[in-house]
Design a protein with these regions (language model features):
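Membrane-interface junctions at transmembrane-helix termini in multi-pass inner-membrane proteins
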Residues: 1-13, 205-235
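Helix-loop junctions and terminal segments of transmembrane helices
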Residues: 3, 122, 126-151, 219-222
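Interhelical loop/hinge segments that connect adjacent transmembrane helices in multipass membrane
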Residues: 8, 35-41, 52-100, 143, ...
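Residue-level signature of transmembrane alpha-helical cores of multipass secondary-active transporters
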Residues: 10, 14, 81-93, 97, ...
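Hydrophobic alpha-helical transmembrane segments
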Residues: 11-62, 235-239, 253-277
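Interfacial/gating helices of multi-pass transporter permease domains
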Residues: 35-39, 77-89, 104-127, 194-197, ...
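Interfacial transmembrane-helix starts/ends
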Residues: 79, 83, 152-169, 173-180, ...
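Interfacial segments at transmembrane-helix termini and the short loops linking adjacent helices
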Residues: 113-114, 179-208
């Protein structure tokens, strides 16, 4: 939906789906029917799919009416080009999103169940903190893509310039609060989970760089430089995996956290570096 300039509709659908999930989870918790826990997610995503399908169906005619086929398209050429892009995109996306899950698998193999529980609680906090910054992505990405298609590079540079400073200040504030109150935050899951405060603090640099990278990655993904974020995802997995092999035997859970942070900092650092280089070409005349 946000790919066809229906960002508001997408956001409303996602918010309603999240509300459905929260209500379902609350019901499961109050009734203590743990066997229905997975159903909360299934109902939420099914509801989101249904809303999105209905929203897109209503706008389909108005969207397609603006499309004009002025020349013949070579199907094989399009498929080949899409396959080349899709392969890198698929590998990069899988690599970046699977890093946290792979770290849990490594903990399950080499460390104890209590370590896995502590690390899972830390990742849960990180995921929650990333929720609001990620909302910016759903606005930046279609906006950058639209402006790039219109050739309005000046507007892209202006938006990037203004939002970048806001994201840095917001991210610094959030990370500072988490660092100071890490022990209290994790105690929400129980006193024994507060032992993971050191792990959470080690992950804070990765949380900070993920937050501030949102305008940079959205710029790359919304323009012709879409492959660079996927390359960064591959770098994340490679660096993290190497660190885990070297550090986990001696440093256990701390080694897992260091490896995860190292991968994120280097991989996303690469994405930010590339974005800075590319945005300079947009700012040459402004």
């Amino acid at each position: 939906l946000y790919g066809v300039d229906l960002v508001k509709t997408y956001a409303v659908n996602e918010a309603l789906s999240a509300l459905i999930m929260l209500v379902a989870l609350l019901f499961v918790c109050l009734t203590e029917k743990k066997e229905f826990l997975i159903h909360c997610y299934l109902i939420s995503y099914a509801f989101f799919f249904l809303l999105s399908f209905i929203s897109f169906s209503k706008k389909f005619k108005s969207i397609t009416s603006k499309l004009v086929s002025s020349e013949k398209i070579n199907s094989m050429k399009v498929i080949k080009s899409f396959a080349n892009y899709g392969l890198v995109s698929m590998v990069g996306t899988v690599a970046s999103t699977s890093t946290s899950y792979i770290s849990l698998i490594i903990i399950g193999i080499h460390l104890s169940h209590s370590d896995a529980g502590i690390y899972s609680s830390v990742l849960t906090i990180v995921s929650i903190l990333m929720f609001f910054p990620k909302l910016f992505t759903q606005v930046f990405l279609p906006e950058f893509s639209k402006l790039f298609g219109e050739g309005d590079n000046k507007r892209i540079f202006q938006i990037f310039n203004k939002t970048n400073s806001v994201m840095i200040l917001l991210s610094a504030l959030i990370c500072l609060i988490v660092f100071i109150f890490s022990h209290n935050i994790l105690s929400i899951f129980g006193k024994e989970f507060s032992e993971g405060s050191l792990i959470l603090r080690i992950l804070i640099p990765s949380l900070f760089i993920r937050m501030i990278s949102i305008p940079f990655v959205s710029f790359l993904s919304g323009t012709k430089y879409v492959l660079y974020p996927n390359i960064g995802g591959i770098i994340i997995l490679i660096i993290s995996s190497l660190c885990w092999v070297l550090l986990v035997p001696d440093y256990n859970l701390v080694g897992i956290a260091i490896g995860y942070t190292a991968g994120i900092v280097i991989g996303i650092g690469y994405q930010i570096f590339v974005a800075i280089l590319k945005i300079k070409s947009f700012s040459t005349n402004y």
